[in-house]
């Protein structure tokens, strides 16, 4: 999963994992976990978790005086995480797939403008952009089939998608069906997630 992928990439780039702690989804008391982390004194904490557990670890870390940078994947990429974490998640960073304030292309900017025209607001989460990308990749694959209703052909063509100009950026899908795409890094500031950087594959 995400933890293993991070560990592999981090070590490859010279990083050292000083402590790995497994937690159970649904846990609420992380004081013992936080105490273990304090003892190791890491430079930062990577939490491949969803928002309920990540927000509680952040809050309990602050309560126990553990002030280290925290980073997660898109499992915390929602306003609920920020609301649950409160001041404890200020400065928390995480990855996401799209940021409407920094569209990566003209196509993306046009989509944001269309969304604002239709809904009355530009603000959107990444699932809106990903939904549009899914639809457009499917249509593109169907158009490359002699019979656009042939599911076998559609599946084959989806897995041949290369540098597709999506709302969220360029997308390539391999023969296993896994997508390679850019990611954005966001940081929590004053109760909102704000764009920080784009990371390209």
Q: What residue ranges belong to the model's regions?
A:
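Extracytosolic ligand-binding ectodomains
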Residues: 1-201
